[in-house]
């Protein structure tokens, strides 16, 4: 469960390491984001020679959350950290690699590129 001011790790190779959530997309009263939801983020920590710079604003999709997500079969999935993947204006991945496992819910939300590049889909 990610909300405004939440800090997340970045699970791709764009050069960003940590981001701060500015907004959860999907309506004015939308408070929380879970796996597969889009958020607006500000880059707080980045590598010196990466594609993104510190302070830049971008959109991202949440790929892992510490708060468990309930599935249709009654099982739950949770991860050790909150992580996201940065997106460009067209809604496509900015990076070319994904680090760490991602949730199967991304496939249902049509983020096929992220699912195909991830080393493990849980």
Curated annotation (Swiss-Prot):
GO biological process, one term: translation
SMART domains, alphabetized: Ribosomal_L14
InterPro entries xrefs: Ribosomal_uL14, Ribosomal_uL14_bac-type, Ribosomal_uL14_CS, Ribosomal_uL14_sf
Keyword RNA-binding: yes
Pfam families: Ribosomal_L14
Assigned keywords, A-Z: Ribonucleoprotein, Ribosomal protein, RNA-binding, rRNA-binding
One GO location term (cellular component): cytosolic large ribosomal subunit
One of the record's GO molecular function terms: structural constituent of ribosome
Family statement: Belongs to the universal ribosomal protein uL14 family.
Subunit text: Part of the 50S ribosomal subunit. Forms a cluster with proteins L3 and L19. In the 70S ribosome, L14 and L19 interact and together make contacts with the 16S rRNA in bridges B5 and B8.
Function: Binds to 23S rRNA. Forms part of two intersubunit bridges in the 70S ribosome.
Identification of the protein by name: Large ribosomal subunit protein uL14
Native organism: Flavobacterium johnsoniae (strain ATCC 17061 / DSM 2064 / JCM 8514 / BCRC 14874 / CCUG 350202 / NBRC 14942 / NCIMB 11054 / UW101) (Cytophaga johnsonae)
């Amino acid at each position: 469960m990610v909300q405004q001011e939440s800090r997340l790790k970045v699970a791709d190779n764009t050069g960003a390491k940590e981001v701060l959530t500015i907004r959860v997309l999907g309506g004015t009263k939308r408070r929380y984001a879970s796996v597969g939801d889009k958020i607006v983020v500000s880059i707080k920590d980045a590598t010196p020679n990466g594609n993104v710079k510190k302070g830049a604003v971008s959109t991202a999709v949440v790929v892992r959350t510490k708060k468990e997500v309930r599935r249709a079969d009654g099982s739950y999935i949770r991860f050790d950290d909150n992580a996201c993947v940065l997106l460009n204006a067209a809604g496509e991945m900015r990076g070319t690699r994904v680090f760490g496992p991602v949730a199967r819910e991304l496939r249902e939300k049509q983020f096929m590129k992220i699912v195909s590049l991830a080393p493990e889909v849980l």
